[in-house]
Structure formats: C-alpha cells, structure tokens
C-alpha cells in the first residue's frame, strides 16, 4: 500500500498534518499524511 511506499522513501506517517521541519510527500491513508524530514 501507500504506507510502505512512504517508508521506502524514508518518510513517516502523521495524523492530519506534518510536524514542523518536515515536508508533505504524499498520503498514507485517508487521514494520515506521508511526511519527510528536511535535511
């Protein structure tokens, strides 16, 4: 699913919004966004 795609891109899933210093890189599920840390 999309969740494993997120982890493969070294991202993580966050509820509704991504924490600061991260970028939205997709969706994990209906309410969870895939977030990626800014390096």
From Swiss-Prot:
Keywords: Antibiotic, Antimicrobial, Disulfide bond. It comes from the Eukaryota. One of its GO terms (biological process) is defense response to bacterium. Disulfide bonds join 6-28, 13-34, 18-35. GO terms for cellular component: extracellular region. Coiled coil: none annotated. The keyword Repeat does not apply. This is Antimicrobial peptide CHP1. The keyword Disulfide bond applies. Pfam families: Defensin_beta. Bactericidal activity; inhibits S.aureus and E.coli.
């Amino acid at each position: 699913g999309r969740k494993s795609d997120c982890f493969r891109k070294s991202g993580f899933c966050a509820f509704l919004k991504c924490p600061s210093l991260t970028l939205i890189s997709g969706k994990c599920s209906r309410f969870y966004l895939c977030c990626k840390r800014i390096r």
